[in-house]
Amino acid sequence: MAKIWDERNEWQTMLDVEIAACEANAELGRIPKEAVEVIKAKADFDVERIHEIDREINHDIIAFLSAVGEYVGDEAKYIHMGMTSTDVKDTALNVQIKQASDVLIAGLEKLAEVLKRRAVEFKYTPTIGRTHGVHAEPTTFGLKILLWYSETLRNIERMKRAASEMAVGKLSGAVGTYADIDPYVEEYVCKKMGLTPEIVATQVVQRDHHAVSYTHLRAHETG
């Protein structure tokens, strides 16, 4: 999980989006294929250099593109064609969220397996039940664990819905009208990054996706 949210991985994911967009534009004939090969071979960045440029110009994506351009050279002019900053940032963020969701889901599935096994193991182990915070009628420890198992299964499904809700990207330009970018670029990049294109967007992926996703995540805290 730490690797997913490491700052270098954040910028690398943005670079992956940019390179994929270059590949799509090359297929459309908007970028020389030779230039794309140069970009793929040379593209890199130094995180501290990004921060250094950002302090001067106060624009993180321009700082990022400038830092990458120092490695790529003349072919850097083909990077970010027709795109707006959030085409890169929102799409890359949602890739990271998808990756993090996969880690969480895998962890919950392992937890569910353990809880199921323990519920059977302690099926006949007596324990005291509680109501109103005090002792009530007897129950079994296995039944208590089975309750946690059932809740974990629901949380797995919630996490899957949350991940699906966030698995969208957009490369549709400054106001979502594809004024300077072909919709094929969005389709190509999203498919390559494991996302689906946002149906309608402005400059950003609409934040109702995030609201629904975070609501599902908060459900884990109620157990």
Which residue ranges define each predicted feature?
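Single conserved hydrophobic/aromatic residue that forms the stacking wall/gate
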Residues: 216-223
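A helix-coil-helix interface module used to build multimeric assemblies
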Residues: 1-178, 182-192, 197
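A structural signal for small-residue-enriched, beta-sheet-centric alpha/beta enzyme cores
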Residues: 197-204
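Acidic, proline/serine/threonine- and glycine-rich low-complexity intrinsically disordered segments
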Residues: 211-213
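The DNA-recognition helices of helix-turn-helix-type DNA-binding domains
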Residues: 207
